Amino acid sequence: GGGRSAIRVQGATTDLYRIVALNNIPNNTRIWFTDKSWDGGTLSFVSGEVNNVWTNTTGSAIAAGTVIQFDALGGATLGTGGLNSGLGSAGEQLFAYQGTLTSPTFVAGYTSGTVITTGVTTSTSTYVPAGLTSGTNFVALGDITFGSSYVTAAIHNRSLADMRSHIHNTANLTTGNTSTITNGSWPTYTFNIISDEPTTQ
């Protein structure tokens, strides 16, 4: 499957984030969201922060290319549930995974904090979990105040691999070191995932 990826995160008032489905999401699919940091030493999430589940309760599959918006109160424009927590305004993580908190299978990740490879994890720093790769299903913005970013271009007609690469490349994101990047400045997105051209034999 192609997974789901964050295309817009706003860590300043009002806290919001959007994801795009990169493959169809069957009805009753459950995806967990957390702003916990990942501890590379214990291969587990650090304590504190919030962990909550979103479920596709629409009665049908959500099509690839669909954008879903979540707010800090646990609301979603499709399905039910979400993070139900305010996102930090500096150095925040957001992970999407399936499975359990103690045995997660990661779908996508995002941080506006510090990525570390040694030392102790904090609320504003994280290891990158196995299964997540920068430029494929993880994006690290660096340590930015207010933690706001969005995919700059509005219209996308790309293969799945190209879509994943584009979304997770910081060169294709607009980031904010102030609280002025707001919902009103977000593009109206169109994500059309096209089939790869067949290889000529």
What are these regions (language model features)?
Residues P187-Q201:
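Enriched but not universal
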Residues G1-Q93, Q98-L132:
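Activation on beta-sandwich/Ig-like modules and their edge loops
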Residues L83-T190:
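Conserved beta-structured recognition patch
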